[in-house]
From Swiss-Prot:
<dbReference type="GO" id="GO:0032722">
    <property type="term" value="P:positive regulation of chemokine production"/>
</dbReference>
<feature type="topological domain" description="Cytoplasmic">
    <location>
        <begin position="102"/>
        <end position="121"/>
    </location>
</feature>
<feature type="binding site">
    <location>
        <position position="279"/>
    </location>
    <ligand>
        <name>adenosine</name>
    </ligand>
</feature>
<feature type="glycosylation site" description="N-linked (GlcNAc...) asparagine">
    <location>
        <position position="163"/>
    </location>
</feature>
<dbReference type="GO" id="GO:0007190">
    <property type="term" value="P:activation of adenylate cyclase activity"/>
</dbReference>
<feature type="glycosylation site" description="N-linked (GlcNAc...) asparagine">
    <location>
        <position position="153"/>
    </location>
</feature>
<dbReference type="GO" id="GO:0042311">
    <property type="term" value="P:vasodilation"/>
</dbReference>
<feature type="topological domain" description="Extracellular">
    <location>
        <begin position="68"/>
        <end position="78"/>
    </location>
</feature>
<feature type="transmembrane region" description="Helical; Name=3">
    <location>
        <begin position="79"/>
        <end position="101"/>
    </location>
</feature>
<feature type="topological domain" description="Cytoplasmic">
    <location>
        <begin position="292"/>
        <end position="332"/>
    </location>
</feature>
<dbReference type="GO" id="GO:0043303">
    <property type="term" value="P:mast cell degranulation"/>
</dbReference>
<dbReference type="GO" id="GO:0098685">
    <property type="term" value="C:Schaffer collateral - CA1 synapse"/>
</dbReference>
<keyword id="KW-0807">Transducer</keyword>
<feature type="lipid moiety-binding region" description="S-palmitoyl cysteine">
    <location>
        <position position="311"/>
    </location>
</feature>
<keyword id="KW-0449">Lipoprotein</keyword>
<keyword id="KW-0297">G-protein coupled receptor</keyword>
<feature type="transmembrane region" description="Helical; Name=6">
    <location>
        <begin position="236"/>
        <end position="259"/>
    </location>
</feature>
Length: 332
């Protein structure tokens, strides 16, 4: 089947985003795995975020391409393709929320931080968050789906019979996942509240940090440490802001589709494609932010690329090691 120009451009851009997402986020995982200075509880949550972004490139984007082209498949196969990206999105949101709480504890209760936040606890939290993400993302399999309307409009059965369970449906997102689920449960219930909580947390972090910096009795070492923590919080708040900017357009389109059905039916395909591309492009951004904002990540990225891709000798930093400060706590 020949693709229209618009569809061909969409597929090409999705493939570019997928390649960049996988490459960049595998690099993040490798950096944390190989550099001792990057192995902190905060970065374990960032690895969880990177793992979700790798899965976006490997699975969610190919699934999105399949759905955009409207191939015919059985209902539950199409529903799985549609729901898988919801699992990854929810995992990303939970990982960002965990990072925000982690930074809040680091700045607001610094003396208890190391005893409260350990690597083992961080890994346990990550496991729980992924289980919750799968539960939320796969909720349509419990019945909140469009099976009745989809099978009433099936194209053809698998074996030429009229058996509804074997019915082939045109695999489009809106054919299998109801907008009521996407807006009321997914957006209003599972996306917007964590984003608002993160906004409150980061505002609180900056207020507390600024108040502490104004204390004249603060020792030079404590002041430097606090400035690093503020720098880290700014970097992570930037990641949350970019996430919101990338994902809110597609949720806005879903809201229009649900609350203004007439306009929703007539929405241009290119607008929906652009919103989807923007949401997927978010998976490319985080490694760029890490490299730009953090010396340890930047050095380790350079070291990995030089050693394994360019087959060059190890890169040496000024002191012969991959930075000396905790990740995301180093000023540039």
């Amino acid at each position: 089947m020949l693709l229209e120009t618009q569809d061909a451009l969409y597929v090409a851009l999705e493939l570019v985003i997928a390649a960049l997402s996988v490459a960049g986020n595998v690099l993040v995982c490798a950096a944390v795995g190989t550099a001792n200075t990057l192995q902190t509880p905060t970065n374990y949550f960032l690895v969880s975020l990177a793992a979700a972004d790798v899965a976006v490139g490997l699975f969610a984007i190919p699934f999105a391409i399949t759905i955009s082209l409207g191939f015919c498949t059985d209902f539950y196969g199409c529903l799985f393709l549609a729901c898988f990206v919801l699992v990854l999105t929810q995992s990303s949101i939970f990982s960002l929320l965990a990072v925000a709480v982690d930074r809040y504890l680091a700045i607001c209760v610094p003396l208890r931080y190391k005893s409260l936040v350990t690597g083992t606890r961080a890994r346990g939290v990550i496991a729980v968050l992924w289980v919750l993400a799968f539960g939320i993302g796969l909720t349509p399999f419990l019945g909140w789906n469009s099976k009745d309307s989809a099978t009433n409009n099936c194209t053809e059965p698998w074996d030429g019979t009229t058996n509804e369970s074997c019915c082939l449906v045109k695999c489009l997102f809106e054919n299998v996942v109801p907008m009521s689920y996407m807006v009321y449960f997914n957006f209003f219930g599972c996306v917007l509240p964590p984003l608002l909580i993160m906004l409150v947390i980061y505002i609180k972090i900056f207020l507390v940090a600024c108040r502490q910096l104004q204390r004249t009795e603060l020792m030079d070492h404590s002041r430097t440490t606090l400035q690093r923590e503020i720098h880290a919080a700014k970097s992570l708040a930037m990641i949350v802001g970019i996430f919101a900017l990338c994902w809110l357009p597609v949720h806005a389109v879903n809201c229009v589709t649900l609350f203004q059905p007439a306009q929703g039916k007539n929405k241009p395909k290119w607008a929906m494609n652009m919103a989807i591309l923007l949401s997927h492009a978010n998976s490319v951004v985080n490694p760029i932010v890490y490299a730009y904002r953090n010396r340890d990540f930047r050095y380790t990225f350079h070291k990995i690329i030089s050693r394994y891709l360019l087959c060059q000798a190890d890169v040496k930093s000024g002191n012969g090691q991959a930075g000396v400060q905790p990740a995301l706590g180093v000023g540039l």
